[in-house]
Every structure is written in C-alpha cells, then in structure tokens.
C-alpha cells in the first residue's frame, strides 16, 4: 500500500534479524537448559563439583571432546550405565548445544604445559 | 549443644589433619615428573593447548590439567582393562601400574588453571 522499496527493504532486514539472532540465542538457551536438567544433578551446578569424585569436571572442557564423548555414550561405543541412558535420547543438535554451553563456562581445566 | 558441636568440629579437624598427612606423599610426588610419575607419555598430547587427535577421529584431546585425580585414575583404569577404547590411550594405560596411575593423576590434578579463569571454547 504505502510501502515503497525502502519500507520493504527495512521489513525484510527486520525479518532476517528476527530469524538470525534468536536462532543462536535459542541454541545457547537450549544448551543451558539441557545442561541444568541433564548434567547438573551429578556433575554439579557449576559443572565442577560432581557428587562423586570419579565423575569428571565438565566446565571449560573442549566442545569437540564433549561432543565425541556424548556421541560415544549414545552409540554405546563408550560404556557407562548412567551416561548411556542420559545420552541415548539426545539429538545431534542437543549434543552440540549442551557441549557448546559447557565448553564456554569458566573452570580449572587446562592443557597448558605447567 | 554448643559444646558437642565444638567437640565434633575438633574431631573433624583431627580427621582432616591425619588424612592430610597421608596425602603428603602423593602431593610431593605430584610436584615433579620422573620415573615414579611417567608423564612423558602424556605431555605430547595433553600439554599442548588445542592439540588434535587425528585417529580414530579428529577432535581436540581433552584438557586433563585440573581434572580430579579420581576421575583420571578411573579413566586410565578403564582404558587399561578395555572398558574404554582408544588405541593410544589403551597402549599407554596398559604400561602403567596402579601406583603410576595414581601419581600421574595427582600430577595432572595439580596442573589446572588457578585461580579459575574463563576459558574459550
């Protein structure tokens, strides 16, 4: 109606923003929610204080290693009664989101030569 | 009430101190690499930030500095008995005694970021 090219362009740009920004934000939110629901009970709310010392600290671990571990637990290539059950229903996207969230958290984990 | 909680904390303190004394040897061993702490097999992958394993699949080898001693021990024993599979880790773990596993695990627990800092993924 009154919309010239300018208005249409602004409208399209607005749509692109609305679609692009929340997608990443939603992934991060999803990762955080998954981690709090699925991991925190055993690995600690900060993912550094597990309820059993033989459970690993997760915060700050490499994302690709976390993903590989979860994939291996999901397929059964790595065996652990609890972790196999936790990983089974996770999708590839879930595994990526939760691993990305955990990897970005602060923690003592390091591969620096000391 | 006050008295008994004081007694209890005294007892707890005594327990903490005696277990600290027992841990002294482990702590001392954790300080330096050597024949008792054979980390020469570890550092080629685990002391290089961002180092990628390329076999059997490509991903960064996990950060183990600052990980708990008990978890590292459990992981090495799982590799040693075949409960967890990775060609190089299985080979490394099979060459270690229980004592060496404990020493290596303590060594790496003591090598985390301190104080805790934010890390990049």
Which residues does each predicted region cover?
Chain A
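N-terminal signal peptide c-region/cleavage motif recognized by signal peptidases
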Residues: 20-22
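C-terminal capping alpha-helices of c-type cytochrome domains
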Residues: 75-78, 86-113
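Bacterial N-terminal signal peptides that target proteins for export
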Residues: 1-12
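Gly/Gly-Pro-rich "capping" loops immediately C-terminal to redox-active cysteine motifs
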Residues: 32, 44-75, 84-88
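Stable alpha-helical elements in mature extracytoplasmic
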Residues: 27, 35, 62, 69, ...
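N-terminal alpha-helical segment
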Residues: 11, 49-51, 79
